[in-house]
Amino acid sequence: MQKQKQELHRGLEERHISLMSLGAAIGVGLFLGSASAIQLAGPGILVAYAASGLVMFFIMRALGEMAIQKPVAGSFSRYARDYLGPLAGYLTGWNYWFLWVVTCMAEITAVGIYMGFWFPDVPNWIWALSALVIMTGVNFLAVKAYGELEFWFALIKIVAILSMIAVGLLMIIAGVGNGGIATGISNLWNNGGFFPHGLKGVLLSLQMVMFAYLGIEMIGVTAGEVKNPQKSLAKAIDTVFWRILIFYVGALFVIMSIYPWQEIGSQGSPFVLTFQKVGIPSAAGIINFVVLTAALSSCNSGIFSTGRMLFNLAEQKEAPQAYGQLTKGGIPGKAVLASAGALLVGVLLNYVVPAKVFTWVTSIATFGAIWTWAIILLSQIKYRKSLKPEEKKQLKYKMPLFPFTSYVSLAFLAFVVILMAYSPDTRVAVIIGPIWFLILLAVYYGKGFHKKNAAAASERNIS
């Protein structure tokens, strides 16, 4: 048995982590999930994205404050352990693993929907299984090669979004693709007003809007594999937030200006529908390919995250020790395979309930994400309070307007959970989420993890 501590390789650069986080966040939440969110809120969805984006900015700043001072793999699980206690770290680590498994189920479900554009007679589950096998293989590449591939995956999405925004603006302003007749932006208020379903519609859309931001915290997961984390993480956090906000709000502004919001259905991506409206039907296939790569990319990031989180849990002796083993290339191979194995449930759901699986899994993933984001905020509050006055002055990357922004962000997250319980479509998440935590608690106390942690704490105090 090898006794020396195995470590993940620091092979990721700033451009990799910026684009990986961007790639993880810009997945089916924007390309497919935005359709159902638009139906709930109409053009008022722009307000929901902007407000949620501001809260996500504060959450990312809270994570950055800790990650820049203490960059480790599986960062927020480790911070929860250090500042909120071993149980919080255990729950957060396993919860993050679970939420990305569920998120990847949404992504591979989307792969099936997008492939149906070309192959309508092939069942969704076949494409879901194919995507899972391919993305698992990609995760066995050396971390630098993986980062490079994900960089280009994300770049394809970004170019597509910017192209769509540019073409859409030309149609809005100059009527390009619409017989020279400028569409203007009157569609934003001509079809029942800017808030056609009132404030209630905007509030009910928040679950899908928050799901669209899931993945932005990936920067924290990469902290243990980043070169020069102090410099890279700060820049990546700031740039990723603004890019995502511009892409989301900008893209949806163009979509709803060109296309009456009530005509944007859930039969396919709003991006494909938008290009068809512009008068370039041949572009629909290209855009469908782009959104297909978006789903694959986000699933790719998810398998990356789950593997690293299992590795971290194994290091803490709260997951099977085999998951703490690395391949020669520095990849937590067994942890990656275990995560991919769990994703087979998503393939099964695509076979059994293909019509309902997307809404179910996005709701459950959002619930898990809200726990993670809340833990980041609570850890940062405890972390800041634990610092001596001189240490607070030395912080290189501070949470702005602390503690006000931390508590307001926590209240916002709690409000979204209440809304999820209110809506019949998303209520399943508020039922399954607590059941999952009860299972984790049963394992924690049943396996005696609480005694091991107490013994370890007492040893540290003695030494």
From Swiss-Prot:
It is found in: Cell membrane. Belongs to the amino acid-polyamine-organocation (APC) superfamily. It comes from the Bacteria. One of its GO terms (cellular component) is plasma membrane. The keyword Membrane applies. InterPro entries: AA-permease/SLC12A_dom, Amino_acid_permease_CS. It is a multi-pass membrane protein. PANTHER family: GABA PERMEASE (PTHR43495), THREONINE_SERINE TRANSPORTER YBXG-RELATED (PTHR43495:SF6). GO terms for biological process: amino acid transmembrane transport. The chain crosses the membrane at residues 17-37, 40-60, 97-117, 122-142, 153-173, 201-221, 244-264, 278-298, 335-355, 357-377, 401-421, 429-449. One of its GO terms (molecular function) is amino acid transmembrane transporter activity. Pfam families: AA_permease. Its main location: membrane. Keywords: Amino-acid transport, Cell membrane, Membrane, Transmembrane, Transmembrane helix, Transport. This is Uncharacterized amino acid permease YtnA. The lineage of its organism: Bacteria, Bacillati, Bacillota, Bacilli, Bacillales. Disulfide bonds: none annotated.
